[in-house]
Swiss-Prot record:
Entries under CDD domains matching the protein: FtsZ_type1
The species this protein was found in: Pyrococcus furiosus (strain ATCC 43587 / DSM 3638 / JCM 8422 / Vc1)
SUPFAM superfamilies: Tubulin C-terminal domain-like, Tubulin nucleotide-binding domain-like
Cysteines joined through disulfide linkages: none
Protein name in the entry: Cell division protein FtsZ 2
GO terms for cellular component: cell division site; cytoplasm
Quaternary structure note: Homodimer. Polymerizes to form a dynamic ring structure in a strictly GTP-dependent manner. Interacts directly with several other division proteins.
Biological function: Essential cell division protein that forms a contractile ring structure (Z ring) at the future cell division site. The regulation of the ring assembly controls the timing and the location of cell division. One of the functions of the FtsZ ring is to recruit other cell division proteins to the septum to produce a new cell wall between the dividing cells. Binds GTP and shows GTPase activity.
Length: 408
């Protein structure tokens, strides 16, 4: 039965017992649903969670985690976790990734309880500050560890979506961001990196604060699109197995996004997406790609097929490509195309990826002490530099000292 097509045509058919049979089928398979969570870590991540909440994303639990109790209080989410409340007293990390890391480790049990039982976990965070940079990798690790400890046959898929600072934000923040991305690569299957400078090229006249909101909107729309294409009926579905095959072990990834309402709108939207890359890499360096279209009700499958021909022409012949499309009446005549490519190389941000994924400098033995453990100190470079051979105290060190802890 083409029930949806009949419904869209304004035809209502009511066969005796049909609804009862349909209900029985739904009940029989309801236990096999895909469980999805979106976890926002730190201020930027929390902003994305609030935006997703306002957008009404269907099919995912929204979880906010932060060291800043005040920001967490105004974040709209289904679950909230205050990280390291005995370390920061809910006052934030002071921009220090070390404090973000310690706070997340101190709240490991609460994090594990919040992320248990999911098949796909998105982690959103801004790289370069304290909580997102330091805590997000810990959250990613705990997602994996919790599943293993509970005897899960298949580990959850962990996809991190992060922003990389503007160059104008300074070298210290950029170095912190690089460090955070390197650590996220340890425990995330895929890390999608949105370079703020590339974002600004799309909307160069936006004030800085508006540019940050635009980044939040982009991440929220991307996550919403993937979640709802998996969970809801679409014109062409991307199922969980498709996402898993593209994202599992995908490593660094980029997103390109484009829109068009021209006569050749689907093709133009894809070309715009391939041009408007959010990370400075060359297309063709990626190994796999996920393409998602958001379209109005009048877009034909033929238009989408022509657009996909462009994708196949632009990407490497060896690339594995999955695509899907869903209808959103609010799009009107506009087509939006989103391209996510995994396995990319970006020397400026990532350098030698293989060298960065050596877990010996990140995985600390289970008997670690959170405060005063020299093994933890080795994980954190001196982001602030030094003078005359002496380490410059960080904001995080000051917070820990104020709370009575020894400096790391």
């Amino acid at each position: 039965m083409l029930e949806k097509l009949l419904e869209q045509a304004g035809i209502k058919l009511d066969f005796d017992g049909e609804e009862e049979k349909k209900s029985e089928i739904v009940d029989e398979f309801s236990g096999y649903k895909i469980n999805i969570a979106v976890v926002g870590v730190g201020g930027s991540g929390n902003n994305t969670i609030s935006r997703l909440y306002d957008l009404g994303v269907q099919g995912a639990d929204l979880i906010a985690m932060n060291t800043d109790a005040q920001h967490l209080a105004i974040t709209k989410a289904h679950k909230k976790v205050l990280l390291g409340k005995h370390i920061t007293q809910g006052k934030g990390s002071g921009g220090d990734p070390k404090v973000g890391y310690l706070a997340a480790e101190a709240s490991a049990q609460e994090i594990a309880a919040a992320v248990d039982g999911y098949d796909l976990v998105f982690i959103t965070a801004g790289m370069g500050n304290g909580t997102g940079t330091g805590a997000a990798p810990v959250v990613a690790r705990i997602v994996k560890e919790t599943a293993r400890n509970n005897g899960r046959f298949q580990e959850p898929l962990v996809v991190s979506v992060v922003t990389f600072p503007f160059k104008t934000e300074g070298t210290v923040r950029i170095e912190k961001a690089k460090w955070g991305i390197q650590r996220l690569l340890e425990y995330s299957d895929t890390v999608i990196i949105i370079q703020n400078d590339k974002l600004l090229e799309l909307v160069p006249k936006l004030p800085l604060q508006s540019a940050f909101r635009f980044a939040d909107e982009l991440i929220a729309r991307m996550v919403k699109g993937i979640v709802e294409t998996i969970k809801l009926n679409s014109i062409v579905n991307i199922d969980f197995a498709d996402v898993y095959s593209i994202m599992k072990g995908g490593g660094p990834a980029l997103i390109g996004i484009g829109e068009s309402d021209s006569n050749n709108r689907a093709v133009d939207a894809v070309n715009n997406a391939l041009t408007n890359k959010m990370l400075d890499v060359e297309f063709g360096s990626g190994e796999k790609a996920l393409v998602h279209f958001t379209i109005g009700p009048d877009v034909s499958l033929e238009e989408i097929n022509k657009a996909m021909e462009v994708v196949y022409e632009k990407l490497s012949e060896k690339s594995e490509i999955k695509w899907g499309a869903m209808v959103d009446p609010e799009m009107g005549k506009t087509v939006r195309a989103m391209v996510i490519m995994t396995g990319v190389r970006s020397p400026y941000i990532l350098g030698n990826v293989n060298a960065l994924t050596d877990s010996s400098s990140w995985v600390v033995p289970k008997d670690r002490r959170l405060i005063g453990d020299p093994r933890i100190e080795k994980m954190f470079p001196d982001f602030n530099g030094s003078r005359a051979g002496r380490k410059r105290p960080s904001v995080g060190d000051a917070i820990l000292k104020e709370l009575g802890f020894k400096e790391l």
